[in-house]
């Protein structure tokens, strides 16, 4: 399944606020579609599927990518759900977003793809690059790159930078000081239901 490129508003009407995907919000409580206003009790499968979709759309992942992250999280000692979130939060496109260098993860992904971002002084153009503690995230030393990020920093997607990150806005340099704590994950979801979803699929 490829990455979603359709109408963002339909997604947030169905799944709720997705801060990584878009700044847009919707006041309508009903789901999209002809029968969106008809109340119905979702099945347990539907609830687990919805939580999985929240995660996939927020971080801009394909189904194949998310499945790989779930498998990687299961190999990590401790809570699989929390490990999954930590892996996703350490993606370079997400780190750029959480530092305020881009208003959304898709915008951050574009910065990375176009070569505007460096990790430890080396240009990295892979959005899924897995950042490590002590990594230094900087902006490529040219006028175009700096102008883009300076504009984004004036209107960050999220108000607060997580405690495991820091940024020098004048130098356009950020640093990863550790692993994100669960409370700092901006997306509202139950990650245990996602682990259950994949466990039941076998």
Curated annotation (Swiss-Prot):
Instruction: Name the Gene Ontology biological process terms.
Output: ribosomal small subunit biogenesis; translation
Q: Where in the cell is it found?
A: Plastid, Chloroplast
Mention any Pfam family matching this sequence: Ribosomal_S4
Q: Which residues form the S4 RNA-binding domain?
A: 90-152
One molecular function GO term is:
rRNA binding
Mind telling me which SUPFAM superfamilies this protein's record contains? Alpha-L RNA-binding motif
Q: Which SMART domains match?
A: Ribosomal_S4, S4
Report the GO terms under cellular component.
chloroplast; small ribosomal subunit
Output the InterPro entries linked to this UniProt entry.
Answer: Ribosomal_uS4, Ribosomal_uS4_bac-type, Ribosomal_uS4_CS, Ribosomal_uS4_N, S4_RNA-bd, S4_RNA-bd_sf
Give UniProt keywords alphabetically: Chloroplast, Plastid, Ribonucleoprotein, Ribosomal protein, RNA-binding, rRNA-binding
Q: Which Gene3D superfamilies match?
A: Ribosomal Protein S4 Delta 41, Chain A, domain 1, RNA-binding S4 domain
Per the record's keyword annotation, is tRNA processing included, yes or no? no
Q: Where is this region: Disordered?
A: 20-43
Q: What does this protein do?
A: One of the primary rRNA binding proteins, it binds directly to 16S rRNA where it nucleates assembly of the body of the 30S subunit. With S5 and S12 plays an important role in translational accuracy.
Which family is this protein grouped under? Belongs to the universal ribosomal protein uS4 family.
Q: How does it assemble?
A: Part of the 30S ribosomal subunit. Contacts protein S5. The interaction surface between S4 and S5 is involved in control of translational fidelity.
Record PANTHER family: 30S 40S RIBOSOMAL PROTEIN, SMALL RIBOSOMAL SUBUNIT PROTEIN US4M
Q: Under which name does UniProt file this protein?
A: Small ribosomal subunit protein uS4c
- What is the organism field in this record? Rhodomonas salina
At the highest ranks, the source species' classification is: Eukaryota, Cryptophyceae, Pyrenomonadales, Pyrenomonadaceae, Rhodomonas
């Amino acid at each position: 399944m490829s990455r979603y490129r359709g109408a963002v508003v339909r997604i947030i009407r169905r799944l709720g606020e997705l801060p990584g995907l878009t700044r847009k919000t919707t006041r309508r409580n009903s789901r999209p579609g002809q029968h969106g206003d008809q109340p119905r009790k979702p099945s347990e499968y539907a609830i687990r599927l919805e939580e999985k979709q929240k995660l996939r759309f927020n971080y801009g992942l394909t189904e194949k990518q998310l499945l790989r992250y779930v498998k990687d999280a299961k190999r990590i000692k401790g809570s699989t759900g929390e490990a999954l979130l930590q892996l996703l939060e350490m993606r370079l496109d997400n780190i750029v977003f959480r530092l305020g260098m881009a208003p959304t993860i898709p915008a951050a992904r574009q910065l990375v793809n176009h070569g505007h971002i460096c990790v430890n002084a080396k240009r990295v153009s892979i959005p899924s690059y897995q950042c490590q503690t002590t990594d230094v995230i900087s902006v490529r030393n040219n006028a175009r790159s700096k102008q883009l990020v300076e504009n984004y920093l004036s209107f960050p997607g999220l108000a607060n930078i997580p405690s495991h990150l820091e940024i020098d806005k004048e130098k356009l340099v950020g640093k990863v000081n550790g692993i994100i704590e669960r409370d700092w994950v901006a997306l509202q979801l139950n990650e245990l239901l996602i682990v259950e979803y994949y466990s039941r699929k076998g």
